[in-house]
Amino acid sequence: MQYRRSSICPFYFGITVTNSELEKIAIQACEQYHLSDKYNTHYVGERILRGKEFDKSQNQAVTRSQQSVYDRQSNMGRRQPMSRLETMLQQSAQRANRIEAYRQRIEEKEQQLENLKRYLEDHHIANQLIAKWFNMSTTRIGDSFFNMELIQERGAYNATELERLRAKESVRGMGILKDAGMDLISNTYVTFTTINYENGDERFERMNKSFQEAGKRMTINGKPVDIDLHGTESEFYAREHTTFNVKVEIYLFKLVWNERIENYFINKYYNCKDTRAFLTDKFFTMTFLGSEVSKCYMSENTGMDASAYNRAQITGQRLENYKAYLPLATIVALDNAYAKLQKKNEDFCVKAPLADVEDGKITAFIGLKEGINKKSKFEVLEKIYNEKDNTFRYKKVSTLTVEKDKVWDNRFTDLGVLSNGENNYVVNLIKNGKQITISDDQGKIKIGDASIDRTYLKGSIRNLAPGMLIRQTK
C-alpha cells in the first residue's frame, strides 16, 4: 500500500573484524541489511565509508573487564588486611580510574561526531539528498534540471487527490511540492552506523591481556605478578571461547527543510541554467538528532566438558559457525538500535497502514523489527484535505494498544526465509535453544509464533478504516 514514509540514507563505517573472512561477511551483512519497509531508502554515494576520518581511535577507553581488574588489584597479593587509610586510597584510585575511562569515552565520541559532521559538509550530503528528491538530471528538460516525479510518487496520491491539487496550482508541480514537501523532504534522515564484532577467541585474548596488564601493576614479595589464562582447562576458558558479540552504534541526522529553504531552492535553483552552484551551496544542511548503542550476544553450546575442551580441534568448525551467526547478530543489533532511535525521536517513528478493521480484529503489518512490543501505543491518523491552503494533512482520530502475545516477529526476513525460520539453520538453532543462544540488551531472544503474520491491536473501531496510518507514541 502506498503512503507517506520517512526516507533514510544509511552509511556504515568503522566495521571492526579481525578475521578477513568474517570481514567480508560483515560488510556484506551491512550492504544487504534491509531497513524496515516502513521507510523509503534514499541512497546517495557509497554506503561503506573508508578513510582515516572513520578509523576508530587507537586510544581506547578502559573496558569494564579491565576496570574490574584494576579495582581488585590492590587486594590481590596482599596477606594482611588493609588499614583504613589504605582502603581510602584504594577507593580513591578506583574512582579516578572510572572517571578517566568515562572522560576518554566522551572525548572519543565527541571527536567521532565532529568527523561525521565534517563528512556531511565536505561531501555536501544535504545537497545530494535534495537533488535526489527533485530527480536532478545532467541535462535540462524543458526549463529545468529538476522535476516533481519522485515527490508525487512518494506523496501517495490517488487520481482524485492529484486533480484537487493541480486545479489550484499556478505552476505545474508546485501544488504537489507545497503539499508533500513538508511531509516527505523534511523527514529525510542520514544514519552513520559503526559496528564492532568480537568472537570468543578475541574476547578471551582481550581479557587475558587485561589480567596480564593488571598483574604488572601488582607485586608479591617485591616481584610483579605473572597472570596468564592460556593453558588452563577452566570452565571460564571454554566459555569465553564460545561467544560472539556485536556492538552497534547509530548516529542519526535529519535534513533541515522548511518553507524558507523550500522557497530559496525553488526561486534560486529550480529553473537555473547550471546546477554546479546548487551542488556546493552550504545553505543546505543537516542537524544531529542523537545516537543509540545496541549489543547482541551469541553463545555456542559445544556440549563439551570444560576439561575436555581443545581449542585447536573446533577452531575450524567454530569459524564456520561464526560465518553463519554474524549476519543474524548484525540484524538483531541494527534493528534494536533503530528501534531505540524511533522511541527517542517522534518524527523518526515508523508509520504503517491499518490492514484489517472489523469487530474483534484490528491489525497492521508492523512488528518486532520496528521495536513494537506488548506495551506499545499508537495514534491513528486520517488524511484530510484542507481546501484553504490546498494541502493534505494527517489528523489524529483514535488511539490503539497491542494485544498481548500477538506481535508479529518480522525480524529475520533478511535471511531470505519466513520469520519461523524453517529453512534457516541458525534460526532453527535459536528456536530449539540446544546449540546456540542469542541475547540482546533486553535478554534472551526467542523466535515468535510463526502463525502470527501481522500485529493485532485493540481499541474502538469507530472512525477507523483500512489504510489509515498508525504511528507509535511514547
Describe each PLM feature range.
Residues 1-474:
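Surface-exposed, polar/charged interaction patches used for macromolecular assembly or partner binding
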